Amino acid sequence: MNQKVMLVEKERFLLNDNCKYMITGRVSKEADIECYLDGIRLPSEANLITVMTGFMRAVETKNPGGKWVEVLVTLPENLQNYKKLQVYAVNGKERFLWYKMKTSDLMRKQGKPQLFVDGESIVREQKKVILAGWAVGTTPVSLQVYDENKKPVKITLKRNTRMDVAEMFRECEVNKDCGFHIQAENVSGKKAYLVAKDENGKKAVYQIGISKGERFKAKASLYSKKAMENYRSNGIHTVIRKSLIKLEALSKGDGLYQTWLKENRVTKKELNQQRKTVFRENIKFSLVVPLYKTDKYLLKALVDSVLAQTYSNWELCLSDGSGADSPIRSILEEYQKKDPRIKVVFNEKQLQISDNTNAAIGIATGNYIAFADHDDTLAEEAFYQMAKEISQHPEADLIYSDEDIIDIRGNRLFPHFKPDFNPDYLCCVNYICHLVVVKRTLLDRTGLLRPEYDGSQDFDFLLRCTEHTDSEKIRHIPKILYHWRSHEGSTAGNPDDKPYAVIAGEKALAGHYERMGIKAEVEYTGCPVVFRTRFVIEGDPKVSILIPNKDHTEDLNKCVTSILERSTWKNIQIIVIENNSEKEETFHYYEELEKRYSQAKVVTWDGPFNYSAINNFGAKYADGDYLLLLNNDTEVITPEWLENMMGYCQREDVGIVGAKLLYPDNTVQHAGVVVGIAGFAGHILTGYDRYATGYLWRLATTQDESAVTGACLMVKRSVFEELHGLDESFAVGLNDIDFCLRARALGKLVVFTPEACLYHYESKSRGLENTPEKKARLQKEVDHFRERYRDFLKKGDPYYNPNLSIVRGDCAFRMAYEKKDEIV
């Protein structure tokens, strides 16, 4: 057996059975699993895992050849009479000790609620503790914070939905609102405790370090406990191997970025040419940076990156919020003497981030204001590229760039290749982030940063900026012009380790909707700094669902039943469009369907198969305010799917909304369409796990897209009529993409939301394109699409990024071998 592939990732008891113990990990492909308690064989079952997490994929990439399994061991009730559980990977006479655990350790885990803290923040001056995480049990779980004397303290508790957690516990139904945000007040002493308690009195406890010493001890205790559990279970070699696998997997992924950098790095010749370039416009950048006891090495790196700029009309405005005894005062005074473009305001009082940034803005004289953090750096061409963009688009009010992350040594990692301005994406997560440049006139209209939003002050500021300008005046430069430092304590290092930022972000987004006059509820998703919006539906609009069908009554019945029995929205009309069915039982089913459901109606299309014409025909019988095109091989998962789609579709600026579609194995089939992939259009991030977040949260966030699939597509009736329905020259393929692009040409947004989720048993509607005739028909429509949208294809999809692959659909980096002219 290949012992190098052996690995245990996690273990736990089933919530609803104290005798069922589950172990998840990796073994060699040929291995079977055997479980023993003090040498006595235990009943167990090992199930193959086919849908892998990101970590599992990384391990497979680095070290292929194993299989991932979920082992369920049945333990005796009298566990106290035994000493040790041992689990072996077995192949013939070969045996490998895969996992072991003392029964005393097992018994400590039995029957308790599951408690996990994603992040914690300690505000010592205010005696405040902020916690974020999740807790589940077989009965409702209460949460309370206690001080070091075990006395309860006042808390504000907010629950949030964590579908990713609910999916983990498949053995029983758990509360999907198992996520939490807790703000505890007046927490004194050196430590505190978060206690999760179920209705049976069983407790799980998380220790919170308040003082710096206790925080260190608490973290050290947690890490050492995990390491010792791993050591006892797997041995020191497995502990080391697991750590190395994680590091090497990351290194391998980063290696692709290093290759991309070599192929795309700006040359010295180009930098020299930039220095010689003179723009007619008077563009002066003021880079404002709040400082607080900044590490001198990091401060030097920042200042040096500004001094190295190829565009010279800038000023660096620094505000030292360290207070009267600032440890960096002398070095800042030296910088001021070194270059008159470096300006510093020294503050006698310590300042928080917003007030500190505002102080820097107060000394800025540029007509464009740029923002940076005190431990980050700029690319050498940052200001040049910004000036070039402004010169070409002088109407621009706000410009942002791509960015990557650098570690403490300056190694470049994890590029953020962003889309062009995407307002619905921004309302889920601050994807814009850095580098941001704002025209002074927009800043004056918007106002300064607001201290009450500290932690998400930049998110609040960006949202307010969008309220005071037009979308066309927000520009994106698809170049990496900013390097975001990742180290302990930075948001780049762990964005979810600052729950106060989440609370401020939620407040900022709610305020944005209120100012815009939009009725909506905002909720944190549990995914780091990602929010979801629930719009209030206006009135009681009807949704007419159009379902083309040819035979396949079993699929159709599953689809219709799921709509009418699972949907929480009840004002529904279902129009089944019969087209060329051949089986007699199909027509018997239609009769039964109309008798069973008053909302259902069957109409007959007599012509040859033409998806566009069939839906246009069905739409004539619809009397809904919204039309929803739906394949017959779909099944509703999310009960609130229609509300979530209508919430966006009812907005004046939105024309079309698409849903997240899954294969039956709970992997992604559709999460938006990128126009240009494979030379015409394609889905992205297919095959990822249902709850994976995807590249830059693309699977977990609502976004504006160029197109969505017609397998589940909602459109305003007025927009459908203005477009005269689907274009019937696209009989089989690309009719949905063409429909979306024509809606965008009307100035309407096309929105993808993962909050509406369905299964899609793809291709059952009409079969695969697997005959020469069908392939020729599809190719003809592809050629037609390419000709119609030639200019769009050349420019590239604005909601994608030219640095990402248009050959693959997994948001891989676009390498030199991808030549656009060979594809379009």
Please report, for each region that a protein language model flagged, where it lies by residue.
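Glycine-rich, basic loop-to-helix element that forms the pyrophosphate-binding segment
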Residues: N347-A364, W605-A622
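N-proximal low-complexity "stem/linker" segments adjacent to membrane-targeting elements
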Residues: N230-S305, A510-E565
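Short, acidic, metal-binding catalytic loop of nucleotide-sugar glycosyltransferases
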Residues: V303-N313, Q392, T561-N571
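Short aromatic/hydrophobic "clamp" motif used to bind/position activated sugar donors
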Residues: I369, L627
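A conserved acidic beta->alpha catalytic loop
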Residues: D320-S330, K349, D373, E578-Y589, ...
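Basic, ligand-binding patches in group-transfer machinery
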Residues: M1-T238, V278-N282, K300, V529, ...
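A short, conserved alpha-helix in the catalytic core of glycosyltransferases
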Residues: L442, E452-I480, L509, W641-M645, ...
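Conserved donor NDP-sugar-binding/catalytic core segment of glycosyltransferases
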Residues: E381-L413, H487, T634-F680
